[in-house]
Amino acid sequence: MAPRSQGTSKRSDSAGDAPDTARKARARNAAPPANGPLPATTGWLLRGKDGRLTAYAPVADGVLRWTERRPGGPDWTGPETLAAPGLLPYLSVARSPEGYVHLVGVRKRPRADGPAETDLVHAVQFQTGRPLRDWASLGNPHGKDREKGERIGMPSAVLDRTGSVHLFVRNANGGLSAKNQSTTGRWQPWGGATPEETLTGEAAAATTDGGVVDLLVPADGAVVRWLREKPDARLERADEEPTAGDIAPGTLTAERTGPGRLTRFWRAGTDGKVRAWRPGTPPTGLGGPGSGPVALLRTPVDGHDCTILAHRGPDGRPYIAAYPTEDEAAGLHWTPSGTPCTGAPALALDGAGRVVLAAFDEDGGLRVARQKEEPGLALAAWRTV
């Protein structure tokens, strides 16, 4: 299945948008470079309960937010700055079935007497376009040890069936630290797991349609996998783990592809190409050299259950591909679209049920391309918001 795309760009003419120069000034560096010191944020384009899309871009000391004016677009508001002093330009983003959006990040505040004070922070948006609840500190798994606290990884957050947040982060000792909410919303003390292997990469959590939390973390010469079968259960080491070899840092993503099943995707550190894996199968190569993580979306295309992928290609442009879900042997074709971008592209369905591919341009501005009203996965011209 070969998606088609138009590479031209149109500018949104929505009233109330910031002037071009102001927009660029506010949105500059909206996403970290794919080869920057932090992994690229994924899953940053979400559809709310009212059908409107929202895009989130972590920047130093805050988050930029764009919101559709009406379901299906094409006009947007933003970028609006959601201040968070000390926040690093990385987020883990999770959405509940009710449309609540949870943002989790790392905050660093310089101290004159030694290492910076580092903590994880959490905020919630309950309705599309509405203000965030205040950022709440979740502390640090190393407590008051600021030297170790500075060396934690980036967080990965998911929601269980009750809507409670489960947070995972690699700690400074090479183990896993974990924190979760109870069903009442109260945060529990830090816990985690200490494998025989030394964890070296970022935690990547996902949940099955049955609510099982499934966690992968790269380690020295291995990939470690844990499962949490129930919201209040302990993390248990999984029986099956991918023989992945070298995973490029910050590239693990996942999509629900069947009852109780997740398909994991990552980029190989050896050749930069995409791999897919499910328990019971070896990793499968999907081609697509490039950088950063792969955006994922499972949706019907012409009546066929398909998994759509998008990533930043070797020339810096967004690339899109699709194949029948869980049929990696069918192959896929990567199609470039638009102009060079920064960070990782994102995929979502809009209020009209169309596939939307979004990316940040090299000035940090938001660009979107929507599926055409015709058979297949052809995209209309890009629009700069």
Regions picked out by a protein language model, each given a short descriptive name:
Residues A2-V385:
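A structural motif
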